[in-house]
């Protein structure tokens, strides 16, 4: 099935570019984010951050020039208003947080890691759904097929694909970001921990433990998702504090 964003851009799988196969860490997130625009009509901002295109790279750090390229490509009919780049803080925040609060403290660069998501495509979150119902549906006659986050984020076939990427990366260390990679990936191979709170309760936040996957041995570290540690949207102050202490202890 072909999925599309509002205003018609295709939803693409966003995956790591296979630039080398000797990475130090394999980092697994949840699902791909998107390029966001500001939607203005009759001089008023009606949606400050509408997802309209797939990011150009996994854990993208934002780029107004690229956002403008997307806007030019959409070429919105003026009867629907106009699109402008969303605030810089709303494009690529997870990617910037990943660099600043995960890679930098570990003295890693993007060249040292292989990035992956349980679901490599963007999905509609409740905020996007609300905005579309209020301002798009029945008012803009450009079809879209933007599915919500599924109950099962990664099925068995997707887990197999992730394992293939893991082996391709050459990494022997794995970082899992948040509850979902524990639930949908780690628990296929090790059921010691069910969620990040279990990790933290055992004083294992940010500490490596061994896991065997497909006969290969890895060191796994579980950390909170950048949404939590970077205070991006809905988040729990607890995980920022826990993550801050982890950084201080490195």
Where are these regions (language model features)?
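A structural signal for well-ordered alpha-helical segments within the folded catalytic domains
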Residues: 92-96, 179, 183-184
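Short, surface-exposed acidic-centric catalytic microdomains
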Residues: 59-67, 88-142
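Hydrophobic/aromatic beta-strand patches that form the interior of the parallel beta-sheet core
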Residues: 26-28, 114-116, 173-175, 219-221
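Feature marks short, surface-exposed loop/turn motifs that line or immediately flank catalytic pockets
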Residues: 34, 122, 230
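Active-site and ligand/interface coordination hotspots across diverse enzymes
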Residues: 1-104, 161-165, 209-216, 242-250
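Short, well-ordered beta-to-alpha junction loops that form the rim of enzyme active sites
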Residues: 30-32, 118, 176-181
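Proline-aspartate-enriched helix->loop->beta-strand connector
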Residues: 162-182
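C-terminal capping/extension of enzyme domains
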Residues: 1-9, 45-58, 82-83, 128-160, ...
